């Protein structure tokens, strides 16, 4: 896996397609490596004529880890957030956005379409707001503005997210913990086949496992707080996609994200949770392609994709 130096750290990356084609940068979410992007999704973008760039966020995969910062106390952070106190983190989402920008610069890419998922969409939002000259368009999937008062995860999703492996030294226990989490937050109407889910998790764990990095990324998200003002400054064409059945980042968060970004287009997908299930890849590719090529209808009425 190739690496590059950006923003003072090592970042693992991968590219697919013709470097002369229109570039599209994929930014994944909490604890998710670049290999978590479904192969058919990446291949589909290449077939549509894009030059696909994906990378491991800091503290994840094969990119630089920040173990020297230690593991944050999430319980204490939650209490502080409830009291309205300012949270400190090992790094900020702004730093992660600078990482993404550094990847583009290191690869000689002047401008790119940006597609972000969950935390990755938050990073994409910051990138689009702070560096609009480098972003052709933004697609924000299953994410949030961080505005106070928005609903949080369901009890089941929160429990699965905070659950630790029965034996943190046993790879099978770790695999079961991740499979349980992904199954819990996944799309109820479009479940990922069990064998495929386990194969993906096993591949990820063989490549890298950094639980401390997940916690530090969670702190970066928590410390970011309300980004509504930043979202209102985004001027690049923006598409917001959200699942109506998302238990981790509820639909209200996606609706608010679209409402905050001027001119944003909203697509709500019925039965979709907090994942990119095989059954929806074709639909997601069509939406992203139409948005990137400026072929979406100009109205701002939310569109609902209902399972046939």
PLM segments and residue spans:
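Catalytic active-site module of serine/aspartate enzymes centered on a nucleophile-bearing elbow/loop
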Residues: 264-308
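Short beta-strand/loop motif that positions the catalytic acidic residue
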Residues: 234, 240-242
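Conserved HGGG/HGGXW glycine-rich cap/lid loop of the alpha/beta-hydrolase fold
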Residues: 9-83
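Flexible "cap/lid" loop of the alpha/beta hydrolase fold
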Residues: 138-168
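Active-site nucleophile elbow and catalytic-triad environment of alpha/beta-hydrolase enzymes
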Residues: 164-167, 213-230
């Amino acid at each position: 896996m190739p690496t590059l130096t950006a923003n003072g750290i090592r970042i693992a990356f991968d590219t697919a397609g013709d470097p002369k084609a229109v570039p599209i940068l994929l930014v994944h979410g909490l604890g998710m490596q670049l290999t978590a992007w479904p192969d058919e999704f990446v291949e589909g973008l290449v077939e549509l004529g894009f030059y696909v760039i994906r990378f491991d966020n800091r503290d994840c995969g094969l990119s630089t880890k920040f173990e020297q910062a230690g593991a944050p106390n999430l319980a204490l952070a939650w209490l502080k957030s409830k009291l309205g106190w300012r949270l400190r983190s090992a790094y900020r989402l702004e730093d992660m956005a600078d990482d993404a920008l550094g990847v583009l610069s290191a690869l000689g890419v002047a401008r790119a379409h940006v597609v972000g998922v969950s935390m990755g969409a938050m990073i994409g939002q910051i990138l689009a707001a702070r560096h609009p000259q480098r972003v052709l368009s933004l697609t924000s999937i299953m994410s949030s503005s961080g505005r106070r008062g928005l609903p949080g995860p369901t009890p089941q999703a929160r429990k699965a997210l905070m659950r630790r492996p029965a034996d943190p030294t046993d790879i099978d226990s770790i695999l079961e913990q991740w499979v349980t989490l992904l199954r819990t937050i996944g799309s109820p109407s479009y479940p990922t086949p069990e064998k495929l889910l386990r194969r993906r998790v096993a591949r990820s764990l063989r490549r890298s496992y950094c639980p401390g990095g997940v916690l530090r990324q969670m702190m970066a998200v928590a410390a970011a707080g309300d980004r509504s003002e930043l979202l209102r400054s985004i001027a690049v064409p923006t598409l917001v996609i959200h699942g109506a059945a998302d238990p981790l980042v509820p639909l209200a968060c996606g609706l608010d994200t679209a409402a905050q970004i001027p001119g944003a287009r909203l697509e709500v997908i019925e039965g979709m949770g907090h994942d990119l299930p095989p059954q929806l890849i074709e639909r997601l590719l069509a939406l992203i392609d139409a948005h990137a090529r400026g072929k979406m209808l100009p109205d701002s009425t939310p569109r609902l994709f209902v399972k046939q």
